Amino acid sequence: MLIGAGLFAAGFTFAINWLALIPWRRAKDRHWTERARLYYPVLVAAKMNLWVLPAILTMSALLLWPDESPHWMLMVLATAIGTTAGTVPMDHEVFPRTPLNEILRLTVVGWLIRFATWFVFLSAIALSPDQFNSQSLIIFVAVLALLILWNRRGWVWAGQKFGLFLPPPERLQNIVRDIGAGMNVPVRELWLMHSVRAQAYAMPESRRLVFTDRLLQILSDDEIAAICAHEMAHLTEARKDYYQRYVLWLMFLPWLFFKPVVHLFGLFGYLVLVCSSAALPRLYRGISRKLESRADGMAKAAERDPGTYARALARLYEDNLMPAVTAKQTTHPHLYDRLVAAGVTPDFPRPAAAASTTWYGHILAGAMGALAVVLVIRLTEQWHLFN
């Protein structure tokens, strides 16, 4: 059953991604903003599918074959591998500039790093008792400590071991040194990250900056400096501001008490967990947009030539096929609005907003929710039967 489930996950993922990309293929000669608008919902759905489809297949096996199905964690593992493998052809089609073997390597590394986190989280839920007691509290504290350690240093350490993080080239070191001196912002660590996407990250708690090699390939020194100024602006955030970003952790941490919550409160307890997890991303996005707008303003103030930062932003969005406008607010303001705020009139009209996900993304999410409700009801019935 495990092999069959994994193969089904891979085939199903490949099929729905291929079908969803048809509008994007037809727009290959259109402006990049239109191609990005059509690609974005497919990307979001594909990312959701990495955990939604394994959840659906695992819960379906538990409900249909409760005695014959493999352990649920093995089902999650097999279907997660299959879903990830089924996503590779889409990545290669959209970004053909990257050799297939390189996409495969980065996919495997990314999957291992991501699954390590989920393995700890799911194991903690499995080991949790049915009641609130000292054991459930110890498990919660242990996972929280591991999460803090992983966030501060663990994922970089793992990335180094897998060859994902490399020492920064002299070109990048000089740019960061110059911008840091001009903004009076010290940087503790600087890393070059191997990625198919052009991105940069700042970690205020560890004063760490990360730039991808793709970003260095497509941007000039002045444009890299402008992006660097934006990331350094995050390093100047007040503690209360960047600690607010950790509100996102509250999406996941309460689920460590899934078993005692459902055991005591049944379906109502499960729905409370779902509603809290659904509400927090909106709060997080609002916090993030405020801090991103602040960083945009500081980057514009630090640019040497007017328009450099806006030009760099536009090139990043175009290269990554990210939409200029989205239907729902995300963690960053719309690119079109960011360009206008930077004092530049975009060389394209304001495009239509990209959809938040695909039609099948909504269907799969709904199916997962329905299966979870049925599974919770069955679990509560079993607990009441044996107690």
Where are these regions (language model features)?
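Polar-ligand-bearing catalytic/cofactor-coordination segments
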Residues: 2, 12-135, 142-250, 283-365, ...
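Basic helix-turn-helix/winged-helix DNA-binding cores
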Residues: 8-10
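Functional transmembrane alpha-helices
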Residues: 251-256
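Membrane-interfacial helix-loop-helix connectors in multipass membrane proteins
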Residues: 258-272
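Transmembrane alpha-helical hairpins and terminal membrane-anchor modules
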Residues: 273-284
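Short, glycine/alanine-rich hydrophobic alpha-helices that insert into or span membranes
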Residues: 367-370
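Juxtamembrane boundary at the C-terminal end of a transmembrane helix
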Residues: 372-387
